[in-house]
């Protein structure tokens, strides 16, 4: 939004700013109101290259997707080597943005996980080279296929990817829509030396926040191709219900 008034010297009236994470929507209510009062340390200036609306089309999900890619690159993922990358929840809020960013910055070997056949073509249009619908299996270890795994849904999907990582593969996990439990075994870790990294977008360092938003406004900018729809309050609860049932597609912004 736009700063109306501020007692913090870092911000002044008229500044374009955003807030994601911290206690917003948890203990600090008012996320859907026209006015909000928040601590200054929660606030991130919106980069000049990005509009207010665009920042919210990205939202927490877009920020989390970018943060996941940031972490994977920190652990060795790079365009030059063109690694095999697996992305789950490919048509959801986080997964769809992740695939588009990866495709935009030059990664070619992206495999997307979807739940339904009708999502296959959508995932391909987003930038996935291959699309799979996974099936459960009981084997503790499978043939290594992927170098990196960006998981957005958790539980059995996390397990599916971990078992298929190549030697010293790296996985990130940022969501739990498929469940909180992880019935994993240690074989992928001790036989292939894989890493599993948790992504927390709530309390991540403020300097990293600003770096991520700068990337989203510049070299990682996919604002013109983001999959989103805009709704009013009358559609709010229906949209939340679709999200909880795994029927939601892309991003949704609420017009207030």
Task: Enumerate the predicted regions with their spans.
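C-terminal hydrophobic helical "lid"/dimerization subdomain
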Residues: 207-256
